[in-house]
Swiss-Prot record:
Tissue: Highly expressed in leukocytes, and low expression in heart, spleen, kidney, and placenta.
Matching Pfam families: PTPLA (PF04387)
Entry coiled-coil feature ranges: none
TM annotation in the entry: 20-40, 57-77, 113-133, 136-156, 158-178, 190-210
Enzymatic reactions: a very-long-chain (3R)-3-hydroxyacyl-CoA = a very-long-chain (2E)-enoyl-CoA + H2O; (3R)-hydroxyhexadecanoyl-CoA = (2E)-hexadecenoyl-CoA + H2O
Keyword field contains rRNA-binding: no
Primary location: endoplasmic reticulum
Protein name as annotated: Very-long-chain (3R)-3-hydroxyacyl-CoA dehydratase 4
Protein location: Endoplasmic reticulum membrane
Length: 232
């Protein structure tokens, strides 16, 4: 007798899709909760809610962004089809801004730019994770596909501008408190505001690379190709 076939739910492909679906669902729920919380708070308290955005939803945002690092592992081991470098750049942007710039400086946490950043990030992620979650189980909607491949075009550059503004606003506090600045032997030192200024320039270089990749991906998914003339 030949080997018995495994039940569908035990097959590797099914387990991979089930895992990805659960992962995308968890991320979608997390980002939806954040966005809903911010919306309700804004309509309840107005501009005052923007000042304490980080205190209200910062923990959940940090949790969602930390878990999103798993996506690099997904791509590396091959269970998620994507390019590693562009995704790495997108994730490190957020990790640096959220954990290094915002979390480490309490004064920055009260800035309006934090609320703006969180709105942009969550808008993109709610659409992206919805699209990915449904794609895993073979469900596709033309409107959702178009939205997931188009929404980032105006919002991603705005995200980068907001991230750059957050860095700019944080510089005086890093200079005053000396956070992450380190004195090294042999009269050397690491002055962290200089590191942030260098990263500020790299942020826009990375934006160009990521934007080019996302546009190429959009063209492939939506099937927008140049029309070739037929030879007579």
């Amino acid at each position: 007798m030949g080997p018995l076939a495994l039940p569908a739910w035990l097959q590797p492909r099914y387990r991979k899709n089930a895992y990805l679906f659960i992962y995308y669902l968890i991320q979608f729920c997390g980002h939806s909760w954040i966005f809903t919380n911010m919306t309700v708070r804004f309509f309840s308290f107005g501009k005052d809610s923007m000042v304490d955005t980080f205190y209200a939803i910062g923990l959940v945002m940090r949790l969602c962004q930390s878990v999103s690092l798993l996506e690099l592992l997904h791509i590396y081991v091959g269970i998620e089809s994507n390019h590693l470098l562009p995704r790495f750049l997108q994730l490190t942007e957020r990790i640096i801004i959220l954990f290094v710039v915002i979390t480490s400086q309490e004064e920055v946490q009260e800035k309006y730019v934090v609320c703006v950043l969180f709105v942009f990030w969550n808008l993109l992620d709610m659409v992206r994770y919805t699209y990915s979650m449904l794609s895993v189980i073979g469900i596709s909607y033309a409107v959702l596909t178009w939205l997931s491949q188009t929404l980032w075009m105006p919002i991603y550059p705005l995200c980068v501008l907001a991230e750059a503004f957050a860095i700019y606003q944080s510089l005086p506090y890093f200079e005053s408190f000396g956070t992450y600045s380190t004195k090294l032997p042999f009269d050397l030192s690491i002055y962290f505001p200089y590191v942030l200024k260098i990263y500020l320039m790299m942020l826009f270089i990375g934006m160009y690379f990521t934007y080019s990749h996302l546009y190429s991906e959009r063209r492939d998914i939506l099937g927008i190709f140049p029309i070739k003339k037929k030879k007579m």
